[in-house]
Amino acid sequence: MVQAPYTDSSSYSLIGSCEGGTFIHEMVQSKVTRMEELGIKWQDVNVADYVRENNLNLEILKECNFEKGEYETKLQHNGYKVRFLADGILKYGDKYFILEIKSISSNGFFKLKEVPEKYKTQAVSYSVLLGIDTVLFLFVDRDLFNMKTFEYTPTAEEKAEWKLNLEYVTECVEKRVVPNKPINADAKFCAYCNYKSVCNKYKDEEVYEK
């Protein structure tokens, strides 16, 4: 969405972490596709088919291809111009759930009691864009492969705030100005952002207020 030069901050540890996360995604999603075969009452729903059947305002940029090991579906919303990768959609009875898979360290996994705050905005985004109320987070311990699941259903207030924030960011892009960093952002907030160097370059200049 944002058209600006970015810095490649890849490191061996980051690459290794990403590769481990990819393996976990593939492992979990390969099992998800076989749930009915394994006697599990949950149903795996093809994301692209769901988009087409429900006439959602989404462009399918890339469909999943299980034979090639590509389990995510790449989508773009035609109204908000937001691109995202959907891990999957599940159905239980008459209710649909967005599936979001997260790999996590053993230490973080042990402490996990609910959906972390840092993932809630993503849950709101996917809920709005796909028109599905509840996101089912599946956390996988990347060391021991233990799993925990948590449901998160965004409120109407969260969805309204998300839309306002997106309108603000879109306006910043159109005006080619740097948005304010959130007040509650900690030192890790920008750690893996590809646009960190761009923001640092203009940090002393006037930023665009909401």
Go through the PLM ranges and name each one.
Residues V32, E36, S103, V128-G131, ...:
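Hydrophobic/aromatic-lined pockets within catalytic cores
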